[in-house]
Amino acid sequence: MEEKDLLEFAREVIREEIKGLERLLSSLDENFSKAVEILRNCEGKVILTGIGKSGHIARKISSTLSSTGTPSVFLHPAEALHGDMGLLDSKDALIAISNSGESTEVLYVLQYAKALNIPVIGITGNEKSSLAKYSDVVLKIPVDREACPFNLAPTVSSTVTLALGDAIAMTLMKLKGFSQEDFAKRHPAGALGRKLRLVKDLYHTGEEVPIVKEDTSMKEAIIEMTAKGFGATAVVNEEGKLVGIITDGDLRRFVNRGGSFENTRAKDVMTKNPKTIKPDELALKALRKMEDHNITVLIVVNEENEPIGILHMHDILKAELS
């Protein structure tokens, strides 16, 4: 096969898969909504089952559900027949995947699920199959033929099933109000998790935070700055509200202007209305704010604008967020 023929064949495979996805797009109906509602109201786990290529797809869908706010596990139907059926509970919901709808092992799982009154969502290419008959809701895989030259190897059907699973998971994620913070809790390691770490995961609190009052002498303010090691201190008023910040840069500018620290108060040197960040905001947002304003520290404040922590650029870089 010449290279141009090889590439054309590969493109044809992809075109067939695109056609399958387009058919899926136009076929979504009230059954999809019913399936999502069952899963949304599930008080237990969402169990995914399937065998062969359908099993691989089911395992991936289960993983996606778990990582986006819907507790889920994969149940291998062959293992289920040898004791793992005990995983099923009456509070669970079951998604069974079989393109033919006649996989014997999967049907055994469905029979047991029905005995426990577990709602069953069947994903199949055959609406007249045994799987469809056992299911409370049927989601049809609208595939005319596979991309395989012999119309045998699961290709279009597996792609469409995976896309349908993603649509289910993402819809549930949206309905449940699953947030970036929720995502970060489930992905603490790796690039995704690091990028979604929050300020409160990294900042310094309590006695570590340098704070002085606006009438504090500059001698005391400098001692506070050097003792805490951040090269800065928050400045608060009598009510404890943040009114400014003093950094190494402020000290240099004050000296360059000919200023003297003798009889000078913190309020005379501080930068008013400093840049701040909230503890529940993304640490990556804090880094961007530092870069945009050419600063290395941010005071962390609560809703009352009271300083509750401090975040240094080194803390963020050490966490390898970017």
UniProtKB/Swiss-Prot annotation:
Pfam families referenced in this protein's UniProt entry, alphabetically: CBS, SIS
GO term, biological process aspect, one: carbohydrate derivative metabolic process
SUPFAM superfamilies attached to this UniProt entry: SIS domain
Domain (SIS): residue spans on this chain: 35-178
Domain of life where this protein originates: Bacteria
Coiled coil: none
Any one GO molecular-function label of the UniProt entry: carbohydrate derivative binding
Family annotation (InterPro entries): CBS_dom, CBS_dom_sf, GutQ/KpsF_isomerases, KdsD/KpsF-type, SIS_dom, SIS_dom_sf, SIS_Kpsf
Record-annotated CBS domain positions: 203-261, 270-322
Keywords: CBS domain, Isomerase, Repeat
Similarity comment: family membership: Belongs to the SIS family. GutQ/KpsF subfamily.
UniProt xrefs under NCBIfam families: kpsF
Protein name, per record: Uncharacterized phosphosugar isomerase aq_1546
Organism this protein belongs to: Aquifex aeolicus (strain VF5)
